[in-house]
Amino acid sequence: MARIALVHAGAVSIPPIELAFRQLWPEAQIMNLLDDSLFLDRGAGALPPAMTERFVTLGRYAAASGADGILFTCSAFGPCIEACAADLAPIPVLKPNEAMIAEACSTGGRIGLLATFAGTLTTMPAEFPTGSDLKPVLIKGAFEALQRGDMKTHDDLVLAAAESLVDCDVFALAQFSLSRVAALLFERFGKPVYSTPTSAVRSLRRATLGPG
């Protein structure tokens, strides 16, 4: 049985990724590591230099705990996760959004990227392949609504923001916490919706167990 470490910078990421594992890889043994000080220290600007070492430390702890694969669920820390992956090779270490990006880009169309945390949009657009037709949108107030448990306001703000992306061919949801609106987006707009948890679980399963 594969043991998978899920590393979180916020508790809101835990329910959607655990649901994705139950649906797509129920036999995996998952362990959760939560350090919400990462989110508190992230801010909306550039990543603080000391942040990378903190991620490497978390990754090494997960590896020492017997993890066969590691998935970071925090989308605003791409360079830190890349450094951790290099440090722990050959253990598979995945960013939360890399599989979703590959799937969304495979369509060849214009991608509407929805995010609720400003820090995500300082790093994530650069992770898309050069030449990608990308239209990012920050949904102000939605993440704060989610944190206080106001799911309806969160969902309504996301759906309203998506109206500005009607010229896009697909929607890409930048954060795990946005996966809760995937079905609502498809129902309203009829466009493909790429969600980070499901894409990440499929990719990590292949990386850990091989194809099949």
Residue locations for each model-derived region?
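Non-catalytic structural scaffold of enzyme domains
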Residues: 1-212
